[in-house]
Amino acid sequence: MTSQKLSLQDIILTLQQYWANQGANLMQAYDNEVGAGTQSPYTFLRANGPEPWHAAYVQPSRRPADGRYGDNPNRLFQHHQFQVVMKPSPDNIQELYLGSLEALGIKPLEHDIRFVEDNWENPSMGAAGIGWEVWLDGMEVTQFTYFQQVGGIEVDSVTAEVTYGLERLASYIQDVPTVYDLDWGNGVLYGDIFKEPEYEHSKYAFEASDQAMLLRHFDDFEKEATRLLDLGLVHPAYDYILKSSHTFNLLDASGSVSVTERAGYLHRIRTMARRVSKVFIDERAKLGFPLLKDDDLREIYLGEHGKYTLTEEN
């Protein structure tokens, strides 16, 4: 708890201003269903290849299996993450993070802030890295990750990802008993906005979804993603990979897939994720990696014997 009880809206605005001052470009939430801010193309795709990338954005994240009809004080079908990606990772990224807490009125020297080792992996997306959970006075509020692999490809430049759980952070700052009691802003409560959708999405995920339709959709989305990748259309293909992932999560939440089938679906998603990462790098290389300004790095990656130098065989 802090002496200044910022609304959730004020927390977002403060984090946006803070990270913009650190050089992050403020992006908008991606307009597709994702399970975490990591799945946004502003993180997943941009972590591939050698180009620098600094961004921050709020991302609504849907996890059908976590829905609880609005009855659980802090477990949600949809929650909100504030995502920061810094590539290459600044040497002082942890200090920058602590500075963001101070901007929110949380003075590090007055609180028990612990970095608890928690190496991260998302098998379905072929992504992994070393990381830490950040605990604030006993509550996990942030996940830190240094990406080592994305889409099954070892990264060229380490991306630091800082993911704030906005509901958890706001619950700590405002000291409220449930997420639905949070002050979103201007006297409007979190529950006024999200409790009814939370109930309805939970009912859909667990009771009302059309399983046969979802199974057909998964196959269709996979076929379309594959077709688009054959055409080199990375971003439309990635949209269909995200749709495949969300459709699988709905099937999984309702218990419609067996343990064996589950492994098969995850493998299919992982195969698409690995391919889109490779095609993304290839397409950026064809453009000459326009965000890569450093001459020495350009020589390493695009010089005569560079890692991504195009040849007739390419």
From Swiss-Prot:
It is an enzyme of class 6 (ligase). It catalyses: tRNA(Gly) + glycine + ATP = glycyl-tRNA(Gly) + AMP + diphosphate. Keywords: Aminoacyl-tRNA synthetase, ATP-binding, Cytoplasm, Ligase, Nucleotide-binding, Protein biosynthesis. It comes from the Bacteria. Disulfide bonds: none annotated. It comes from Leuconostoc citreum (strain KM20). Belongs to the class-II aminoacyl-tRNA synthetase family. Its EC number is 6.1.1.14. The gene is glyQ. SUPFAM superfamilies: Class II aaRS and biotin synthetases. Pfam families: tRNA-synt_2e. Tetramer of two alpha and two beta subunits. This is Glycine--tRNA ligase alpha subunit. Its main location: cytoplasm. It is found in: Cytoplasm. Gene3D superfamilies: Bira Bifunctional Protein, Domain 2, Class II aaRS and biotin synthetases, domain 2. GO terms for molecular function: ATP binding; catalytic activity, acting on a protein; glycine-tRNA ligase activity; transferase activity. One of its GO terms (biological process) is glycyl-tRNA aminoacylation. One of its GO terms (cellular component) is cytosol.
